[in-house]
Structures are given as structure tokens and as C-alpha cells.
């Protein structure tokens, strides 16, 4: 199954459908239909906003129609799913649920979770509301104290201000099956800020945090505003030995179908030295792009590790 716990307007699932369409283009009509059904039935998409859920459902139907994967006028044929069947599956698998305080609607956890969680603090969420202060305190308290059925606290990495993206990172790892992959688009501040230390410890010490792509403040991406943007890659429940940090990246470093170009700047953080020079805070250093400055920074890091 593929999941997005804050599906928004459905941008990620649209991209997945387009990749799916490209990859099945050479198959028989029956194989295309069966593969498309399998993909739709494996979707696990939720959002706490009814508006977002309605938008995502409509987007998925429109994309399926444009890709020629559904029969708009009938009950389907050898190569296409009927519209009524597609809409029924989509309605069942795109739901309005609070992923932070609610229960996941599916028994089987996802093996792949890709999302861009909201970059908000609780106090920003209710800014301007006449009862904002009371609402903020109430939600913050519920999130801090929320317990699972076995008595465990759901969010163990809360520290300082309650930032929603931190909660979504921790929750995403809980939702996935052991060995499942999580990729999240988050602010770069999570890599270094002190208040994210408990979350980084969780990423490194209880999971395999193996990659991060970092784009600086002037990234020219369509999201992120003036903040640095990072994409973290985690395998749930495994062991972190080496984190490969790519960056600072530019738009030209992104390669369609490959991820990043082969000469994108990167360096590797080995667990032992990394723990030593960060005093087990697992902070990821902000690197210069210049080859000379980069070499100096890496040399300094090596000395700290020694």
C-alpha cells in the first residue's frame, strides 16, 4: 500500500498515477486494467480537511480520465476500469481522518509513505481566531498526552513548541510496516534545531535514516517559501549506519526519473564519528556548495570527530 497522511489536493498521488501510466504503457490491455485496479485498491490517503479530501478525490478521477485508465461512459472494458467502480474505490481509500489524533482506517500498514506535512506550529494554526489561545492550549495538551490503547504515549519526541511537521514525521514512522519506506518534505530546520533533537534520535536510533536532500533558502521551488527545504528518506524499524546528505542542491540537480544528477554534491555521515562530533544530537551540518569551502568544512568535521 501507498499512503499520504496529509493528502491535500492530491499532488503526490497524481504523480504516482502518471508514473504508473508510463510504466504500464507496453503491457496488454488486461494487464493495464489489473495493475491500475491493484494500485487504486492499495491507496491509503487521508486528510483532516473535508475540502482537501473532496479535491483529492476529484483530482484522481480527472487524472485517471486524462491518462485513459477509466471508461468515462460505461462500466469499463478489457483495458479500462468503469467510472462507477473507480469512484467507489477512490471514495473508500481517500478519507477525512485526523492522522495525528485518530486511528488509521486500514488494517495493513503502508510500505511506502510520501507526504509534505503542514509546516505549522500550533500557535500559528489558530492565529487570529478569537479563541485562539484556548484552542492552542487544548490541542497542544491533547497531542502531548495522547496515549495508545496499550498506554504508550503516541508522540514521544515533542519538545518545545508543538510543530505539526515533527508530529507527522513521528506518526508516519508509526503507520508504516517494518521495512517500509518514508519520504517527507520538511523544513531544513529539523536537521539542526535543538528542539528537534528527540526526533532526530528517533530517526537514527530506532530507524534507518539513510538520506536527506537539502535545498537552501533560495531554492526556487514551488513550495517552502523563504525556508530551506529538505526531503528525508527513512526505512522504518531498521538500523542507521550511514546517512547520505545531498546538498546544497539546486533545481538543476533534480533529474526526472533518476532523482538527482550523478554529480550532485553529497557527503556521508558515519554513525560513530557523527555521534561523536555532534555529541549524539545527530545534527546534519549545513554545507557550502563551493568545492574549496566544502573541503574545508569536511576537514573541520573530521577533526571534531577525532
Predicted features, each with a name:
Residues 43-47:
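Conserved SAM-binding motif I beta-strand of class I
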Residues 2-6:
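Conserved class I S-adenosyl-L-methionine
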Residues 19-42, 63-88:
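Flexible phosphate/Mg2+-sensing switch loops adjacent to catalytic phosphate-binding sites
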Residues 7-14, 21, 48, 53-54, ...:
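Signature of N6-adenine DNA methyltransferases within the class I
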